[in-house]
């Protein structure tokens, strides 16, 4: 380490065999509360990993650190073999290179619990905003692709409406289309169905299932046990900022080793 910079090289070290996402010994505190206590996780291209745990276990914080919406206190995050550089700032750790963070975010899309659509824009405008203004792609091309993506998630007929005129399930599907429009290598889902009425959950899960079948790399924080069992190829259970259980769905659901995970499963049936 030099000049106060951690995990930074001038030229990113990229390996063809590198995981799509790698998190090593990640730690994050808010004040005196340590939320992540040395979490490690690795996702290969095409992995669908469901991240389970009770409220406050650190699931969402981990996703937000991967996308640098929160800056970890220590640890290493690698996206496609490129290590995100951190350095000590006046208020704690900060990105060593904001342009690197911007580049990483263009490859790692996040779908939020609360949709995060821009209320003053139509659904179509929401989807094309970043491709046009961040990626500088031709507007006509972005519109054509956006309409295909909205068709894919089943709401192309809503393209000229504003978010407030859509149901929660439709808004979340629009948010997924917006994420896909950036051509991400990795998709992060932060409890994408928890804000929805029960009858709307299925329509969002169907879209997510189809994305998994396409071979997309997905990290999904969820309480949907059926999705975790049937769609994921790996399940990670966090408890108080630590990975308590990890493995294939058949293993962790069929013969859980952790007593806490057993209790968690029984409380979510």
Model-derived regions, located:
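ABC family nucleotide-binding domain
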Residues: 18-249
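ABC-family P-loop ATPase nucleotide-binding domain
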Residues: 1-27
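C-terminal boundary and immediately downstream tail of ABC-type ATPase nucleotide-binding domains
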Residues: 2-5, 237-240, 250-269
